[in-house]
A protein has these predicted regions:
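A short, well-structured alpha-helical segment
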Residues: 2, 30, 34-64
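Short proline/glycine- and basic residue-enriched helix-capping loop/turn segments at helix->loop/beta transitions
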Residues: 1-25, 53-85
Length: 85
């Protein structure tokens, strides 16, 4: 997801502490494609977890799931990688 990579802001405190890793989040894609109920499933640190959640909440609308020809809510999981160069 290029959008995530372009919109993540690595927290300065995490850079100073050399924090890296992958944050796993879950969320609901609503019938209109909006994102709700964002939760950290497995995190790294308070700052990186907060940034991962912020980016997911700001994402553009998704294409909603369909069941029997109708749009439905669905739960999704997504990892966000934090890596220092």
């Amino acid at each position: 997801m290029k959008w995530i990579g372009k919109n993540v802001v690595y927290p300065q405190t995490s850079i100073e502490m050399n924090e890296q890793g992958r944050v796993f989040l879950s969320f609901v894609v609503e019938k209109d494609g909006s994102i709700s109920n964002v939760k950290i499933e497995r995190g790294i640190s308070t700052d990186l977890d907060r940034e991962a959640k912020r980016v997911i909440q700001k994402m553009p609308k998704w294409i909603p799931a369909e069941s029997a020809g109708k749009t439905v809510r669905c739960r999704a999981r997504l990892p966000i990688n934090f890596r220092l160069n």
